[in-house]
């Protein structure tokens, strides 16, 4: 067998439909677009327009709102913290806070604080001072011999 003899399996590929190649082809003349009208023309149909029928975005009721006062936390996983400690970017002997995480390049911006989640494994004995943490994350930190100080009680 040579490279020029390799073929796809039978039925693995499908011939493309050649449109507008004469009426004998079965998809000539209108090329499957029906007769006249906006959708028969070139160019894209208007998004959300359903041909005079009440569109879905108007049939469904409005719901919810965006709370402009909501706290926005930067999420950091324990695996990322461990990777930074392994790469000697974070000093595990000192207290690790949002500023230390930013300086180490673990997070880009602080926003309203840092929230720690339990993704990944933590082997280092780390003392954290963050705005919030999930319960499994707190358990993993304490199991590794570290400590955590939550700055806001609402973020647990």
Curated annotation (Swiss-Prot):
PROSITE patterns from the UniProt entry: RIBOSOMAL_L15
Disordered, as annotated region: 1-39
Listed Basic and acidic residues bias regions: 1-13
Keywords attached to this entry: Ribonucleoprotein, Ribosomal protein, RNA-binding, rRNA-binding
GO molecular function: rRNA binding; structural constituent of ribosome
InterPro entries in alphabetical order: Ribosomal_uL15 (IPR030878), Ribosomal_uL15/eL18 (IPR021131), Ribosomal_uL15/eL18_sf (IPR036227), Ribosomal_uL15_bac-type (IPR005749), Ribosomal_uL15_CS (IPR001196)
Chain intervals with Gly residues compositional bias: 21-35
Record function comment: Binds to the 23S rRNA.
Protein name as it appears in the record: Large ribosomal subunit protein uL15
Biological source species: Rhizobium meliloti (strain 1021)
Gene encoding the protein: rplO
